[in-house]
């Protein structure tokens, strides 16, 4: 008797009467050598309602010798799964709906034609963002591995994609959590009768501080600044103590304590795996929607709110003729849904094999897009109120972009409305919970990837590995906690992570659709869901989605953003530095390709064939066990 690898996922047979199938905790199909007599019946595939041929049939038939084998793990070795389906959905929604939905989408929408922007945004979502989102969920759920080891089952030569994703995740964690630290500082500062950014009588204020909402007659000059702006720049960031990237200054101990608290919450939320993080997101993923609803109702009742809504949605159809509008729409939907970061692969890998990931992709994508749209009303009703109070045009009030829109403009509006303390507390608490969800997801993507790749080292030491990851991210964040840390945050966001993750996602889409094969991928989906993806999805995966990513990358390279923060213009060398940081992650892909081709024995043609052929079987469920099949 001998065992041989499975030639097909369909060639599964049961051991005769279940005898001698178990060895060292693993079920094995005994395959006879030539001359042995074989009697076997096929078994149910375990996920289809239709029984396989021979299932439940007493008829026995012979099969060719040495054609099939079975290696199935016992049920107790099963991969961890989500406690409930809703845990997975809330985790994915919490990951996709982040701070960018609140500040980036509203700003980009009004800047690119208001209501007219929804047309390119919807088109890019349908043909680019959602197909990539669906692809990653299906890949993760079928192969049940993180972003590194999954490539052994798809196309081994592209394993460098997984390492690149892990490095990108580290860069993101280095600056993203700093924004949460700012929000936490604001939250702590909000527990006062009078919010500290409402007046110019504080120690950090300058002679240029001018309060728009003061009862005194005021004169606004070119150099005038609001109390909210000075609180953000001079008290929270202390950016006046830095001369720029060439001299960042010291570390703000207040922000360092805030980020330590943030990382502590993160650690105890994810240290035990998806069983614990899946429960935490019941709070962190739902709380923002409660607060958004409260803020929406409050904003709609403010005087002048209609001015903000009109400014937000009034369509400028001429904008649709500008290429930049379509670029912004494509970039926004991609970074909002978040394919290419390894998170969707990790989350989906903990699903049950026959979970309807197609439905999940559609539901979570729609929820994400609708959240962005509704967030625009939350922001612009308040901006309309500010414009009414200042007797200015909304465009003058809404000139701030990025974090400044939240920490200066919106914070100032909250400070000058009734019950300001209450609304400030819930608003900044909402920002923190939005950020926590995304950080949980980003780090889980890395943790799952490393644990799956090195199970013999870390499988029983997850808590220690998570601690090491969190500590590493904390030390990586120190440069963003300096007095000039805001300059670093903007540089990392614009240059170090954006282009890199776009390129990684493009190569991933090509590797799956062209090398692994769209036909094989669709077969995998059919085995899970019972139906094959239609032609729309196939065309998107093979051509439209890769072109969608290539379009964004080329547009970025042809017209890179000019960096400016407050009154500081970034030096030219900083752009080169940003590209170098981004390249440091992407370089993992060609480096691993070269390593693979050099280390694989055989002729050059044989090396290529071996390198693009899956080398590890994928487990297929069969009743109470999982079957390994090639």
Curated annotation (Swiss-Prot):
Show the SUPFAM superfamilies listed in the entry. SNF-like
The residue ranges for the Cytoplasmic side of the membrane come to 1-87, 136-160, 272-277, 348-360, 444-463, 517-538, 596-630
Keywords associated with the record: Antiport, Cell junction, Cell membrane, Cell projection, Disulfide bond, Endosome, Glycoprotein, Membrane, Metal-binding, Neurotransmitter transport, Phosphoprotein, Sodium, Synapse, Transmembrane, Transmembrane helix, Transport
Entry binding sites for serotonin: 98, 439, 494-495, 556, 559
> Which terms under GO biological process does the entry name?
amino acid transport; brain morphogenesis; enteric nervous system development; membrane depolarization; negative regulation of organ growth; platelet aggregation; positive regulation of cell cycle; positive regulation of gene expression
What are the start and end residues of every segment in region (Interaction with RAB4A)? 616-624
Top-rank taxon, per record: Eukaryota
Disulfide feature = 200-209
The molecular function GO annotations come to: actin filament binding; antiporter activity; identical protein binding; integrin binding; monoatomic cation channel activity; neurotransmitter transmembrane transporter activity; nitric-oxide synthase binding; serotonin binding
Taken from the record's topology, the Extracellular segments are 113-115, 187-252, 298-324, 381-421, 484-494, 559-574
Annotated membrane-spanning segments are 88-112, 116-135, 161-186, 253-271, 278-297, 325-347, 361-380, 422-443, 464-483, 495-516, 539-558, 575-595
Q: What is this enzyme's catalytic activity, as reactions? A: serotonin(out) + K(+)(in) + Na(+)(out) + H(+)(in) = serotonin(in) + K(+)(out) + Na(+)(in) + H(+)(out)
Which InterPro entries does the record associate with it?
Na/ntran_symport, Na/ntran_symport_serotonin_N, SNS_sf
* PANTHER family in the record: SODIUM-DEPENDENT SEROTONIN TRANSPORTER, SODIUM/CHLORIDE DEPENDENT TRANSPORTER
Q: What extra comment accompanies this record?
A: This protein is the target of psychomotor stimulants such as amphetamines or cocaine.
Q: What is its biological role?
A: Serotonin transporter that cotransports serotonin with one Na(+) ion in exchange for one K(+) ion and possibly one proton in an overall electroneutral transport cycle. Transports serotonin across the plasma membrane from the extracellular compartment to the cytosol thus limiting serotonin intercellular signaling. Essential for serotonin homeostasis in the central nervous system.
Q: How does it assemble?
A: Monomer or homooligomer. Interacts (via C-terminus) with SCAMP2; the interaction is direct and retains transporter molecules intracellularly. Interacts with filamentous actin and STX1A. Interacts (via the N-terminus) with STX1A (via the H3 domain); this interaction regulates SLC4A6 channel conductance. Interacts with SEC23A, SEC24C and PATJ. Interacts with NOS1; the interaction may diminish the cell surface localization of SERT in the brain and, correspondingly, reduce serotonin reuptake. Interacts with TGFB1I1. Interacts with ITGAV:ITGB3.
Identify its protein family. Answer: Belongs to the sodium:neurotransmitter symporter (SNF) (TC 2.A.22) family. SLC6A4 subfamily.
Q: What is this protein called?
A: Sodium-dependent serotonin transporter
| Source organism per UniProt | Macaca mulatta
Q: What is the lineage of its organism?
A: Eukaryota, Metazoa, Chordata, Craniata, Vertebrata
């Amino acid at each position: 008797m001998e065992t041989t690898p499975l030639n097909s996922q369909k060639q599964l047979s049961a051991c005769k009467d279940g005898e001698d199938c178990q060895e060292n905790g693993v079920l094995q199909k005994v395959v006879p050598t030539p001359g042995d007599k074989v009697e076997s019946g096929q078994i149910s595939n375990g996920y289809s309602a239709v029984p396989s041929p021979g299932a439940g049939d007493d008829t026995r038939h012979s099969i060719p010798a040495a054609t099939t084998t079975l290696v199935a793990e016992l049920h107790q070795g099963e991969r961890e799964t989500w406690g409930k389906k809703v845990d997975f959905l809330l985790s994915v929604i919490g990951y996709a709906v982040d701070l960018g939905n609140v500040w980036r989408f509203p700003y980009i929408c009004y800047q690119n034609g208001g209501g007219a922007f929804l047309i390119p945004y919807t088109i890019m979502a349908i043909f680019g963002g959602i197909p990539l989102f669906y692809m990653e969920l299906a890949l993760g759920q079928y192969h049940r591995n993180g972003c590194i080891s999954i490539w052994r089952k798809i196309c081994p030569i592209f394993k460098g994609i997984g390492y690149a994703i892990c490095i990108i995740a580290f860069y993101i964690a280095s600056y993203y959590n700093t924004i949460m630290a700012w929000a936490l500082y604001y939250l702590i500062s909000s527990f006062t009768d009078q919010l500290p950014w409402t007046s110019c009588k504080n120690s950090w204020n300058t002679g240029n501080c001018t309060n728009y909402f003061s009862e005194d007659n005021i004169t606004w000059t070119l150099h005038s600044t609001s109390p909210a702006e000075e609180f953000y720049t001079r008290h929270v960031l202390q950016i006046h103590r830095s001369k720029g990237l060439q001299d960042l200054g010291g570390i703000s101990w207040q922000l360092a304590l805030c980020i330590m608290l943030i990382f502590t919450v993160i650690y105890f939320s994810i240290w035990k795996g998806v069983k614990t993080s899946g429960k935490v997101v019941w709070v962190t993923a739902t709380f923002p929607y409660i607060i958004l609803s409260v803020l929406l109702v409050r904003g709609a009742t403010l005087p002048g709110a209609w001015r903000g809504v009109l400014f937000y949605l009034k369509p400028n159809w001429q904008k649709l003729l500008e290429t930049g509008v379509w670029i912004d729409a494509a970039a926004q939907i991609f970074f909002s849904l978040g394919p290419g970061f390894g998170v969707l692969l990790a989350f989906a890998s903990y699903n049950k094999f026959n979970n309807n990931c197609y439905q999940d992709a559609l539901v979570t994508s729609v929820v994400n897009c609708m959240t962005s749209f509704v967030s625009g009303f939350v922001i612009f009703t308040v901006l309309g109120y500010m414009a009414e109070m200042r007797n200015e045009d909304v465009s003058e009030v809404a000139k701030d972009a990025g974090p400044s829109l939240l920490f200066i403009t919106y914070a100032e509006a909250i400070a000058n409305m009734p019950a300001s303390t209450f609304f400030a507390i819930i608003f900044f608490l909402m920002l923190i919970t939005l950020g926590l969800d995304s950080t949980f997801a980003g780090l889980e993507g890395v943790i799952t990837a490393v644990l799956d790749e090195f199970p013999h080292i870390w499988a029983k030491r997850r808590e220690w590995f998570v601690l090491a990851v969190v500590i590493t991210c904390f030390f990586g964040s120190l440069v963003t906690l300096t007095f000039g840390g805001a300059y670093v945050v903007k540089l990392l966001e614009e240059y170090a992570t954006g282009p890199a993750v776009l390129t990684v996602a493009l190569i991933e889409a090509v590797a799956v659709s062209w090398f692994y094969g769209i036909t094989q991928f669709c077969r995998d989906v059919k085995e899970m869901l019972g139906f094959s993806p239609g032609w729309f999805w196939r065309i998107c995966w093979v051509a439209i989605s890769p072109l969608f990513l290539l379009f964004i990358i080329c547009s970025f390279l042809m017209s890179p953003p000019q960096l400016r923060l407050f009154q500081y213009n970034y030096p030219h060398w900083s752009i080169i530095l940003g590209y170098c940081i981004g390249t440091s992650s992407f370089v993992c892909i060609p480096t691993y390709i070269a390593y693979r081709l050099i280390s694989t024995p055989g002729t050059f043609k044989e090396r290529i064939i071996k390198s693009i052929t899956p080398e590890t079987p994928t487990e297929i469920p069969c009743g109470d066990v999982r079957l390994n099949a090639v």
